[in-house]
Amino acid sequence: MLYSLFKKYLFRLDAEEVHEKVCKILKILSRSPFFCNLIHAQFGYTNPKLENEILGLHFPNPLGLAAGFDKNASMIRALTAFGFGYLEAGTLTNTAQSGNEKPRLFRHIEEESLQNAMGFNNYGAVLGVRAFERFAPYKTPIGINLGKNKHIEQDNALEDYKAVLIKCLNIGDYYTFNLSSPNTPNLRDLQNKAFVSELFCMAKEMTKKPLFLKIAPDLEIDAMLEITNSAIEAGANGIIATNTTIDKSLVFAPKETGGLSGKCLTQKSREIFKELAKAFFNKTILVSVGGISDAKEAYERIKMGASLLQIYSAFIYNGPNLCQNILKDLVKLLQKDGFLSVKEVIGADLR
């Protein structure tokens, strides 16, 4: 209730301006274990039925915060206190970049969706590593999302991903290669069999940590399956589906540029994930993201084959109680259907 009133004021302000103010507060809170413990006492939720061991990592629950919120890995401790089972920091690039011109973050309030054209704005890998290490270790697994610098030509993309990975080798529990943001020119062109294979072969030689590929929801199904297969054969441990969409028909008044996320993406993301799971469930770890805002949708994605979930836009629209609400209701749903734990639910629709 309190957040609903607060949100009315915040939503009168520029979206990126609000995000920056919230980030400043979260950075300050991250400095204090006391305040982080208070946040967790109020907004966290722990239940052994939600725990899982995946790729050697212990996840207290399957609900993660997607990349893009904490671009510089500077407020992880405060964010995880809100009840997330894990968090993905970034996107970090090899060198700092300011991103695209403002305004570049927009709300579609009626659709409970966001449109962002940020462009991987971040302080660069060196400062990202420094920020991460300041409060490490963390209580949950932390992924590092890696992207290509805007000024790097396609022919040099592999070397650029290698450079940013090298700088980040000592931080994080897993890495996600982001080839699917619509806000870096031609980045999505790298979503092809040859490049994906080279990328994961290279990364596999550099680290034993789990590696993920994040894919776009706008790929043709056959192309998506082909690229996914190429990634897995080259050493990818999992697939994150999906990033934002450029399908502007999903909202009433779209802006010219930027990817859409939130409730408008629910159906599209679910359809892509369903095809992905049909082909690759039990062959790799599948992470579902896109339009998840309540326990019912979370439960459906897990039954479809998702070992893990990620949210972003729903956190903006629903506020700090979101994780707790989803997780409590998720336990009720799995118990109602006779499951003893979330582990038993994964892929139930495919059995």
Swiss-Prot record:
Reactions it catalyzes: (S)-dihydroorotate + a quinone = orotate + a quinol
Any one of the GO BP annotations: 'de novo' pyrimidine nucleobase biosynthetic process
EC number(s) reported in the record: 1.3.5.2
InterPro entries: Aldolase_TIM, DHO_dehydrogenase, Dihydroorotate_DH_1_2, Dihydroorotate_DH_2, Dihydroorotate_DH_cat, Dihydroorotate_DH_CS
Top EC group: oxidoreductase
Binding site for substrate: 71, 116-120, 178, 183, 243-244
Membrane is among the record's keywords: yes
Membrane topology: Peripheral membrane protein
Pathway: Pyrimidine metabolism; UMP biosynthesis via de novo pathway; orotate from (S)-dihydroorotate (quinone route): step 1/1
Co-factor binding details: Binds 1 FMN per subunit.
Cofactor: FMN
One GO cellular component, as annotated: cytoplasm
Keyword vocabulary terms for this entry: Cell membrane, Flavoprotein, FMN, Membrane, Oxidoreductase, Pyrimidine biosynthesis
Active site: 181
Residue positions binding FMN: 67-71, 91, 145, 178, 214, 242, 262, 291, 312-313
A UniProt-annotated Pfam family: DHO_dh
Superkingdom to which the source organism belongs: Bacteria
GO molecular function, one term: dihydroorotate dehydrogenase (quinone) activity
Listed transmembrane segments: none
Subcellular location, record wording: Cell membrane
NCBIfam families per UniProt: PRK05286.2-2, PRK05286.2-5, pyrD_sub2
Function statement: Catalyzes the conversion of dihydroorotate to orotate with quinone as electron acceptor.
Oligomer status and interactors: Monomer.
HAMAP family on file: DHO_dh_type2
Protein name, entry field: Dihydroorotate dehydrogenase (quinone)
